[in-house]
C-alpha cells in the first residue's frame, strides 16, 4: 500500500489520493499516516471498521465507503468535505414481535465489514466468535460468502450465485428476519447478469414469508457504473422487479435496514487536529512506475472469463487454464502431494 501511495503521489495526473484499508492494526495505521502526512496532495483515508475521532487539514478521515467517495470528489473540486448519510424513508413494514433481525448475504468482505460495523455501532450488540460470519450477534448476522470457507472448490459468489441462492432459501424458515441485505457487484469478471439469477430467489423468499404471514424487506444495492458490461440501470430494474428495494450505496442500505427495526447509527463527530509534516522517503522504484504507466503483458491463470477485460483494453495476454487439485481442500491436497511423490509399494 505504501509503495502505491508513493507512486500516486509522483503521478502529475493525480489530484487527490484515496486510501482504503480493511481492519488494520494501530501500528500499521501509524506507519501509513506518517507517509500520508509527508504528502502535499490532499488525501482521504478510510480504515474500515474504525470510528475516526479526528480529521486533519490535508487528510480527511472517513467513516464509511460512501463518505470516502464523496469526500474524494469534493476535495478534487477544491470544496470542503460535507457528507450527510441518507436512508430510504419511503420503505415501511409491519413486523411482528419476533422479527428483529437483519441478515446480510454479501458477495465480498469489504461491504460485509462495513455493514457489520454500522450494525454493531447502532445496536451495541457484540459479535460472537464464529468464522462463518463477519458479524453474528444475538439478533443480526452478516456473512461474506466470498470468504475462503465458502469458496473451497466453488467459484466466487460474484461469479456463481449458488451459495446466495441457498442462503435465501434457508432464510425463508428464519422467523426472526425482518430485513435482508444483498449486494450485486458489477464489472469485469463478475457474472454477466447476476440480478437475473437472484431475482427468482428473492421472489420465492418474499412469497414464502407472505404465506407465513410475515412482512419482510429485501434491500439491495448495485455496485458499479453505467459503463459496466452488465448494465447498471438494468440490474437495478431486475432486482426491483423481483421485489427488492434498491439503495444507492451500502451505507444507505444498512442505515435503511437499521431504521426499519428502530435503530440508528450516528455519524462520528471529528475535531480537526494538527500534526507536524513528516519527512518520509517518497522515492518510487522505476519498476513500479513502469507497472503503472507502461504497457502490460499478462499471464492469466484460471478463469478464462477474466481475459475479457484484457481483450477490451487491447492488452497482450497468455491464458493458462488451471484449478487447484482436490477442489482446493488442503488436507486432500497434502494426501495427493504425498502419493505423487511416494516411491514405495502400496
Where are these regions (language model features)?
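Catalytic-core regions of core metabolic enzymes
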Residues: 1-281
